[in-house]
């Protein structure tokens, strides 16, 4: 949704290029391969597949979980950032953060703790229940909150390929810089979508 250099200096054009055109594209290609001989899966939207992994044919379940999660999670990650420097959420999302985390800063602390506490690869998530209650969680690999009945509002990719070219092993610095690029209008739209 933006040029490779648009998130610089927070995330470099090189990182974004490799992340999007190499890593993300591999998930897209592998998901398409997994779906190629599964006609009953092809007619369903990706979010429905991830919500209903237990209903997928056994031979396809793991490939769709891993690669479908890789596609969905990356799309949310990329769309959840913007070229403009972000400030804070507004509207219903801001009120929900105040209610559920005590403050915007309380949310940031929990999100950062989840991102830094994720051992190895995975994501930190801001998720909502259908009631609108927000929480923060971390999940390994390409697991997706949809599979747990939760609605993803934002995600922060903490796989090393998301930051290593720019920050090497300084994940905390990457997390701090990610906060500066959060696409709050997108997050607000996602939050409103949890009740539909």
Residue ranges and their predicted role:
Residues 1-196:
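Feature for soluble, non-membrane regions of globular proteins
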